[in-house]
Amino acid sequence: MNKVSVIIPSYNRFEELLNAITSIKKQTYKNIEIILVNDKSSQKEYYNYDWAKENIKIIHLNKNTRSIFGYPCAGYVRNLGIKIADGKYIAFCDDDDIWFPKKIELQLEAMKKTGCKMSSTDGLIGIGIYNSKKSYQKFNAECNLETIKNKFKKIGSKIMNNGFPNILDYKFLKIHNCIICSSVLVEKEILNKINYMKNLRNGLEDYNCWLRCLKFTNNIYLKDLCFYYNGQNYAK
C-alpha cells in the first residue's frame, strides 16, 4: 500500500484547520501522512498544539510569505511540505476545506485503472465551515458548468456537450481551470519533474502547476463529490 503525503498550508485558521485534519484522518485509505506548513500564523494555538501526538509533521516558517514576497504565497509554502514528503503520491488540502471519506481510495483506484499519474474530482462549494445539514452546490457540475461550456463553445469545441470528460489533458485545462487544489492527487515523480509549484500569487500557482503536470501525464477526473471547498474568496 503506497503512502500518500497530504500537504496543508495554513495561516490563522486554526479551527478550520482541525476540521480539515479530522476529515483526512477519516479517509478509508489509511497509509497517509499529514504535513502541515504554518505560514507564521499569529494564533498561539499553532505553537501550543501537540502535533507530534497527532502524528503530524509540522513546519513553522520564520517569516510569513507576505513579508517575503509581498503577497501570500501558498506555492512556496506547499513546496516546503512536498520536499519532506515520504509518499509516492502527493495530495493537497487547504486548511479551510475538508475531504469526504473515500476521496483517496477512489482516486487511487481510478489512477491505477487508467494509468494517469494525476487525479482531481468534483466536490461541493459553500461559504464557511462545512455543515452536513446544509445543501451545497456541486463545484463543477452546477456552479461552473455553464461558464465552462460557454468557453468551449466560443472556440468551436463540442467536448463539453455531454458534461465533463473523464480524462482532462493539457489542451482541455488550458481553456479553463476546473481543478480545485484540495481535490488533487498526483505522483510525486511528476512534481519532481516540474520542480514543484512556482512562487506566484495565490490563485495562480496551482493552475500553473496543473498545466505543467499535464505535459507529463493526463488527469483522471472523478465526478464523485470528494471534497468541500470553502469558497469564501472564490470568484468565477
Label the predicted regions.
Residues 9, 61, 116-126, 222, ...:
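Short glycine/serine/threonine-enriched helix-capping/active-site loop
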Residues 21-66:
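Acidic donor-binding segment of Leloir-type glycosyltransferases
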Residues 75, 148-236:
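Conserved nucleotide-sugar donor-binding catalytic segment
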Residues 94-98, 122:
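The conserved acidic donor/metal-binding loop of glycosyltransferases
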Residues 63-85, 106:
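Glycine-rich, basic loop-to-helix element that forms the pyrophosphate-binding segment
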Residues 1-25:
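N-proximal low-complexity "stem/linker" segments adjacent to membrane-targeting elements
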Residues 102-152:
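Conserved donor NDP-sugar-binding/catalytic core segment of glycosyltransferases
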